[in-house]
Amino acid sequence: MKSLILTTLALLPLVSCKPWVQLSHQTPISADRNLIPGAAEKSQLDKIIADSELLSLHRSLTEIESISSREGDVGDFLVDYLQKHGFTVEKQHVSSDGNEADKMKPSSFNVYAYPRSSPAPEIILTSHIDTVPPFIPYSLSLPKSSSTGSIDRRAIHISGRGTVDDKGSVACQIIAILSHLKSHPDARLGLLFVVGEETGGQGMHHFSRSPLNTSPPTFHTVIFGEPTENKLVSGHKGMLQFTVSVHGKPAHSGYPWLGRSAVSEILPILSKIDQLGDIPESEGGLPSSEKYGKTTLNIGFMEGGVATNVVPARAFARVAVRLAGGTVEQAKERITAAVRSASREYRADVRLWFFSGGGYPPIDLDTDVEGFDILAVNYGTDVPNLMIHDHDQPEDKKVKRYLYGPGSIFSAHGENEGLSVGDMEDAVEGYGRLIRAAVERGQRK
């Protein structure tokens, strides 16, 4: 991201990351907790996957590498698959930084699809098709019944990059829509699979600015797919990112008093920043809420100096803030005030940049469909990146937004990323329930 706002200040402090508390605890399943299948068992597993439209689709998606900015192959696969199943498919080419004025990269494009008889979907299911690096191949492991040694089908564990985040949701959404269309062929349903979610949401931003996102919207419901343990999400924390840099004076490390260490000066500034989630709002801290808990900060990157025998002339750090309440502007004001305070105390030469894009406050979501467990999450999604033009609509006409999907965020992005067959099959049923509820609500309008 590029920085838009530059504030020159003086600063100093250090940080501690707070754990996510809203999600239920789930330990990722590692290889040593599952059995590596032998040749005969592998044949059985392959047959189970091949005999299921859902599981074979999921395998095909996962076997295609689609790290952010390299989503072209998986996009082409989806275009072909959806066209064969009777969908009209539109491709939206997206540049690497989301700027349409730049040369488009044909390897990155959104996939927008709808039944040929329904060009204006009223219900959209959306997920992202990019993954974080590195690519991890698709694999199956084999939990067994201790008594009989037979395969527990629902417990078969599927591993690989993107199995959870987010190709599990992609596959389940497609199968859920196909299932609904079999019995309701005139249902106005659509699929939107976007690129670049893991690197800033360029794909969803592009769709938001495109003619496909009408004002007022043709759709009354959007169902976002992310790993939520098959629970319906009531909302997620907001997000704000910034960079802090300190300029010192270089000198020989044998005579440090002749220079000024930028590293020594940035540490107390970062420490001050890191405490903002624990300081009461009345004393200048960042907000907390009953729903989302505390605002948390993470110093995710820090760099400074050139050699151990040189007093460092420059140091900088990048910080991510997960907002539990308030507005982005309020958070910026609190952070800026904390930096100013530390800068005056330590007389450091400091600069503060808030990342472009502006950040976003906590995002509340709809949970009015019965039969789901509910939770709030700390991670970010594409939900705030979709600009919905319903601000002038009465409350009962505003677009519903749901967040749901298979797998756990605790295994997403990790070396043991994976989920079970049961997780996938339950998610198809859950998406089906959300679709049916949305259709019924649309008929009542």
Curated annotation (Swiss-Prot):
GO terms for molecular function: metal ion binding; peptidase activity. PROSITE patterns: ARGE_DAPE_CPG2_2. GO terms for biological process: proteolysis. It comes from the Eukaryota. One of its GO terms (cellular component) is extracellular region. Zn(2+) 2 binds at residue 165. Its cofactor is Zn(2+). Zn(2+) 1 binds at residues 165, 198. Residues 1-17 form the signal peptide. It holds the Pfam family M20_dimer. Binds 2 Zn(2+) ions per subunit. Keywords: Hydrolase, Metal-binding, Protease, Secreted, Signal, Zinc. The active site is at 197 (proton acceptor). Belongs to the peptidase M20A family. This is Probable carboxypeptidase UREG_07869. It comes from Uncinocarpus reesii (strain UAMH 1704).
